[in-house]
Amino acid sequence: VLEGAFDNFPSAWKHAGLLHMYIHLMEMSPHPEKALRHGDILTDLIPDAGHLVHMATHIDVLCGDYQNVLSRNLLASKVDNAFKLYAGADNFYALYRMHNLHFAIYGAMFLGQKAAALSAASRLREEVPDEVVKLYPDIFETFVAAAPHVYIRFGMWDEIIKLHQPVDTELYVTTNTLLYYAKAVACANLGKHSDAENYVLNFAKAYAEVPDSRYMFNNKSRDILGLAEEMMRGEVAFKLGEKTVGLNHLRKAVELDDNLRYEEPWSWPVPTRHALGALLLEAGEYDEAEAVYRADLGLDEKLPRPSQHPKNVWALHGLH
């Protein structure tokens, strides 16, 4: 129906609703690239609507156009700020402001742009101060947990250890748990194995307090943190010398990642295959590492199209 409208009615290409709907229709399809033109048009069609400026990036991220993902979401955020000055910060549109900055983090990380990712993460935190989180904690709190993923993506191990656990661990229950995960991974990579094991224990205690009601869009925080646990245990075991055990945990993390409910951006910000591929290379398992990276890049079509990350620098570097 939508494609018929675009084929038969030239005015459809200036209809924001049709363009918006088509992008959402195609983002889970085998051919998201069909909506690239629609996104390009929508980006400039209503320049004062931040969400519509952002919308094309739902397709860009699936097609490996990560520079557009970053630049368009930063532009959308600029528009959002203008609306915030007009309408204030305490309204439903706060979620859209968070979403655009959250998306910008993904674009920056896939590009390998550390400074841009850290900047977007810092700005995202500014959008979710305590008073905002308290309005809808089951939705808003998980945005605060974005920063540790950026630190891990860029191997900022010393900086991770210096991160403070939240004072209000009930309000920031997901963030508290994820920070223990990050610190365990950091210590494992720094060779501080005893500290890593202690953080694993702290993670388990914190994880037990996470309620089923806490979500990151379509996925429960508990499911996302269950994936984090496998990643954490995999890194800790591997760096301790238990390579087989570690790799098996990471393979389980990949399985859990593949079975999370679809959303954009993805609930787990750093593709699990990147860590698995890197440690497989370190272990000399070159054939499996190649297969892991090829799957992540979508070169072998083994993964559903929305689960592929074409042209990302991390998997390309590993494959090279």
Predicted feature descriptions by range:
Residues F6-S11, D40-D48, K78-V79, Y86-N91, ...:
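Solenoid-like repeat scaffolds
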Residues L25-M26, D60, A108, Y151, ...:
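Residue at a conserved register position within TPR or TPR-like alpha-solenoid repeats
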Residues M21, M55, L62, F103, ...:
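"A position-specific structural signal for the A-helix of alpha-solenoid helical repeats
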Residues H31-P32, Y66, K114, W157, ...:
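TPR-repeat structural position
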Residues P10-G17, H31, D48-H51, A89-F92, ...:
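Structural signature of alpha-solenoid helical repeat junctions
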